């Protein structure tokens, strides 16, 4: 019942990649409040205390914020080719061309806004991961096969019950 959590090298989006495997599963929405403290501003969360108000985050206040945003962007452009290949294979070439064009148009503005030239690397990263999408796809499928064998062996060896709710 548990599926492998695959992430190709240096990319983000492992939850999105996992979602492509859920077609034959019942996915339940559980209404819970979650809070992602991406910058470590709310230490009280670890004690179970939620903030009453949120701090305003300015892109100009901290290189940490800009660095984190840059790394997130890198992760996004790295996972886009594989995610698109998995979810829209018939439209893959068109979507990737459109994405590259839009990225090329927007990067000069992004670099100027953040006053950081390294955002230009996003275009090269997208092209690299697009070029390697077949390899990443094969790794993803290999991970699924290996995981399936491991689960089958674990069940066959009696290490876990075959129907987890029935024990």
Regions found by a protein language model. Give the residues of each.
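Generic alpha-helical propensity signal that fires on short helical segments
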Residues: 30, 45-48
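Conserved ATP-binding loop and adjacent catalytic segment of the adenylate-forming AMP-binding
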Residues: 7-9
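Eukaryote-biased recognition of electropositive, low-complexity segments
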Residues: 19, 42-46
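Terminal low-complexity segments of carbohydrate-biosynthetic enzymes
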Residues: 50-167
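Catalytic donor-sugar/metal-binding loop of nucleotide-sugar-dependent glycosyltransferases
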Residues: 20-36
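Conserved catalytic loop of SAM-dependent methyltransferase domains
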Residues: 39
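Acidic donor-binding loop at a coil-to-helix junction in glycosyltransferase catalytic cores
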Residues: 11-17
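Conserved nucleotide-sugar donor-binding
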Residues: 1-5
